[in-house]
Design a protein with these regions (language model features):
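Specific aromatic-rich, kink-prone transmembrane helix
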Residues: 109, 131-134, 146-163, 188-195
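Membrane-interface alpha helices of multi-pass inner-membrane proteins
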Residues: 28-29, 131-135, 152-157, 164-179, ...
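Transmembrane-helix motifs of polytopic, lipid-linked glycan transferases
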Residues: 97, 101-117
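Short hydrophobic/aromatic helix or loop-helix immediately within or flanking a transmembrane segment
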Residues: 52, 67-93
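C-terminal luminal/periplasmic domains and tails of membrane-associated envelope-modifying transferases
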Residues: 358-400, 404-411, 416-626
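Membrane-interface transmembrane helices that cradle and orient dolichyl/undecaprenyl
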Residues: 152-165, 271-281
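Transmembrane catalytic cores of multi-pass membrane glycosyltransferases
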Residues: 41, 53, 179-278, 308, ...
Length: 626
């Protein structure tokens, strides 16, 4: 058949297969957009945005804590907080929809860059899905998405003749949205440097426009409330030996090829990137950028998304080389109908990837694990007529308290080293773990109240003091304690006097009744709470524990299944609840089976916890349920 005779049929088929593949790429990539992590950063960003909207000014000093109050605060993401607070204030879930929109645009740019180098939508699709899967755990609602998006934008426009003219306005915006602008400057600087080296080697005109663009972009980044001092924020992480470096996102990436784990997906991106390098089609710039970012990602897992996006063109070349080899062996798969069938199959797979991904209802709560925050204790604090002024709080809850209990100074939050010094970080970890000398640190900071996880060491230590701290509010997530001395003690009110009869109050009531052994009262309160808020995950955990104490195996299984119906992919907390409940019943086999279902492949699973679970499974004396 001649080319002219098949064109009327093949051209529409090619367009159709390409359109279906593009749709499949975006649908499939978006399925990875909802990680199961406690997105603690969003709350302080929203609190900052709220402050700016309400006061009409950008705070240059910290207005939220009692440990750094009045100290200089470089809020490099103030504009993100301003935008997202406006969305959140209209409706909380608008922040989730806005983040999803940014991610779809990000994946579209990654796919476009991958297609441009590979000229294959199949290769571009495989690359984009692999990139999305490797980024999955890091895609919570926070400003770093802007850096990923703008990095993809730079990579997709670098070869535009007038691209350098776009850089100054882009970096003026970027420097007010996220400190990752410094990476972007490094990216365009690397590009200009390699262009210069090639020009000198080949005796061609120097890339003056590129260097003018780099210099103007660096200057434009200074257009922000802190001027060129904004550069201090990214530069302080180059040699990061602060106690904040103990945070798990700054730890090195593990070695694994298991695609179910964050590390396995990262190393598979590395593998396809290497295939792309060996294809002989890679540019020196793409190789150099991948080399820089892979070192960053290996040294700190938080940089995995930057590497994946930066290496996407090379990975696409790798997939393209594999597809080319397959076509040479099986020429028939290159014809139009097999391509159309492959496109349809890709769309079907993309739809199946959404299995178990429940975006509705309450997408923001699902995206941030919102039910894990101390909403009841925060409401109690906000309702107090004379709240504490020197609260010691759990690190990951500081931003939440800034938003939900405004006006109550906090001890620390996830603004980390952009505000708090290393000494405070060391004090925090010592106090939280009730290490030697914690009492002196409490006195030095004037702590008059504590809000920490219920099972934390410091909560137990405070209740064992000679003058025990008084519990104002407690539920499975958190405990709020007040110092034994001082006028605050006499003014403490029962939660029922300050809080409405909502799911939080009923959860607290059920939790306390269960601990006292009053199982009927606990069950009644928890069932009422579950009817009121079926998305409060900790209610299901408490109902499992009540069933365990009643030795009701069927009821325990029922509430496990109910929790999985609400949160099909919130495996770890649900199976952790089930494991503890079965263990309390003395049901070794069921406990072991639940323990085996806990997934340990995420980047925010501490090595100690991973090793403990694996050791318990390995040393168990019973066999799993068949």
């Amino acid at each position: 058949m001649t080319k002219s005779s098949r064109t009327p049929i093949s051209q529409p088929l090619q367009h159709a297969s390409s359109a279906i593949l593009v749709l499949a790429i975006l649908v499939g990539a978006a399925s990875w957009s909802q990680p199961h992590v406690d997105g603690s950063d969003i709350w302080w960003h929203l609190a900052s945005g709220q402050f700016i909207w309400q006061n009409g000014e950008i705070p240059l000093d910290d207005p939220f804590s009692h440990t750094a109050n009045g100290d200089r605060w470089t809020n490099h993401s103030w504009l993100w907080g301003w935008f997202f607070w406006a969305a959140y204030d209209g409706h909380a879930d608008m922040a989730a929809w806005l983040n999803l929109t940014l991610l779809v645009v990000l994946f579209a740019l990654v796919a476009w860059s991958a297609w441009r180098v590979s000229r294959s939508w199949l290769a571009a699709g495989a690359t984009t899905w692999l990139v999305a899967a490797s980024c999955h755990w890091f895609l919570d609602v926070r400003p770093q998405i802007v850096t990923l998006l703008f990095t993809a934008l730079l990579l997709s426009t670098l070869d535009w003749r007038r691209a350098p003219w776009l850089w100054p306005p882009l970096f003026a915006l970027w420097a007010n949205l996220h400190a990752g602008f410094a990476f972007g400057l490094g990216l365009i600087g690397l590009c200009a440097l390699l262009q210069t080296e090639q020009a000198v080697r080949c005796r061609q005109p120097l890339p003056r426009a590129a260097w003018v663009g780099v210099v103007c972009a660096a200057l434009a980044a200074g257009i922000n409330p802190w001027g060129f001092a904004i550069y201090e924020v990214p530069l302080q992480h180059i040699y990061y030996e602060s106690p904040f470096g103990a945070l798990i996102e700054w730890q090195a990436t593990a070695a694994s090829l298991d695609p179910r784990t964050y590390a396995g997906r990262f190393w598979w991106v590395v593998a396809f990137t290497l295939v792309g390098v060996l294809s002989g089609k890679a540019t020196r710039f793409s190789i150099a950028l991948a080399a820089v970012t892979v070192i960053m990602a290996i040294s700190a897992r938080r940089f995995i998304p930057l590497f994946a996006i930066s290496a996407a063109p090379l990975a696409a070349l790798g997939f393209g080389a594999i597809l080319d080899a397959a076509r040479r062996r099986l020429p028939a798969i290159s014809s139009d109908w097999p391509r159309l069938v492959a496109s349809g199959a890709a769309l079907l797979v993309a739809i199946l990837l959404w299995n178990g991904v429940h975006f509705l209802p309450r997408p923001l709560q699902r995206w941030t694990s919102g039910e894990s925050y101390p909403s009841g204790a925060a409401a109690y604090l906000a309702a107090m007529p004379d709240p504490p002024q020197h609260l010691f709080n759990y690190y990951g809850w500081g931003g939440y308290l800034m938003l939900q209990a405004p006006g109550i100074p906090i001890f620390i939050d996830s603004r980390a080293s952009t505000l708090y010094d290393d000494g405070l970080a060391a004090d925090y970890f010592s106090m939280l773990n009730a290490e030697q000398g914690w009492q002196e640190k409490f006195e030095a900071h004037g702590v008059d109240a504590v809000l920490v996880p219920t099972q934390s060491r410091i909560a137990a230590a405070l209740r064992k003091q000679r003058l025990a701290w008084r519990v104002a509010y407690v539920d499975p997530r958190s405990v709020l304690l007040f110092a034994p001395a001082g006028p605050a003690r006499t003014r403490l009110a029962a939660p029922a006097r300050l809080l409405p009869e909502d799911a939080d109050l009923l959860l607290s009531r059920g939790f306390q009744s269960r601990r006292r052994g009053n199982l009927d009262r606990a069950n009644t309160a928890l069932l009422a709470a579950q009817r009121m808020d079926p998305m409060q995950l900790f209610i299901y955990g408490e109902l499992m524990f009540v069933a365990s104490l009643r030795e009701d195996a069927d009821e325990l299984r029922h509430w496990t299944e109910e929790a999985l119906q609400v949160y099909p992919r919130r495996w770890n907390p649900i199976w952790s609840f089930a494991e503890q409940a079965w263990d309390a019943m003395g049901r070794c086999e069921e406990s072991l089976e639940a323990l085996r279902k806990i997934r340990l492949g995420g980047p925010f699973i501490a090595d100690e916890l991973r090793n403990e679970v694996q050791t318990r499974i390995r040393e168990s004396q019973c066999s799993p349920v068949r």
